[in-house]
Regions:
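Short aromatic/hydrophobic contact patches that present stacked aromatics
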Residues: 89-91, 122-124, 160-162
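Helix-turn-helix
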Residues: 132
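Acyl-donor (CoA/ACP) binding surface of acyl/acetyltransferases
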Residues: 99, 103, 118, 147-148, ...
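Active-site acidic-Proline motif in GNAT/NAT acetyltransferases
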Residues: 93-95, 99, 127-128
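Conserved catalytic-core motifs of GNAT/GCN5-like acyltransferases
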Residues: 122-125, 137, 142-158
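Acetyl-CoA-dependent GNAT
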Residues: 3-18, 22-95, 106-108, 112, ...
């Protein structure tokens, strides 16, 4: 895990600072807006984000820009076998992409998972999303040899990537 950035999660922005923190119930409406912006072709509906919040509140982090709202989030699914988990979603608003916020969200949640004694972290990514694949590789994730065809249904192939903590 030596590739993780420093432990300071505060990141300068044009209007002050953003803070990575645990999601709160009052964040859910704003989280829906953020998810719709980050994933316009397939955002989570409110009820799904609500259920994921109810199931995994300790492993759902947001990038809070204060009065400017939420700019990113990462969501981890923790099954009963807490030694293995899945990154279910990582999203950053368009105006904040390319600034390292996705990396910081991932680093924060990976530190949290390491502290929770998780040994294996998996995620899926669209095979054409080279930017995300490179981010995950830079954090130590390794890709399976080939994308899984129709992983999320017809024409929704995904590359499965794994990190051993």
């Amino acid at each position: 895990m030596s590739t993780l950035p420093a432990d300071d999660f505060r990141t300068p922005t044009a209007n002050g600072s953003s803070l990575i923190r645990q999601v709160e119930e009052t964040d859910l409406p704003e989280l829906v807006r953020l998810d719709e912006e980050a994933f316009p072709e397939g955002p989570y509906p409110f009820f799904t984000l609500r259920q994921l919040f109810d199931l995994y509140p300790d492993h759902m982090l947001v990038l809070d820009g204060g009065e400017n709202g939420l700019h990113g989030y990462v969501l981890v699914g923790m099954p009963r076998d807490a030694h293995r988990c899945w990154i279910l979603s990582l999203g950053v608003t368009r105006d904040r992409r390319g600034r390292g916020y996705g990396r910081q969200l991932m680093a924060a949640v990976l530190r949290q998972l390491r502290d929770d004694a998780v040994r294996e972290v998996l995620l899926t990514v669209e095979p054409s999303n080279i930017t995300a694949i490179e981010l995950y590789k830079s954090l130590g994730f390794a890709a399976e040899s080939a994308p899984r065809k129709d992983y999320f249904g017809p024409n929704a192939d995904r590359l499965v990537m794994t990190l051993h903590l």
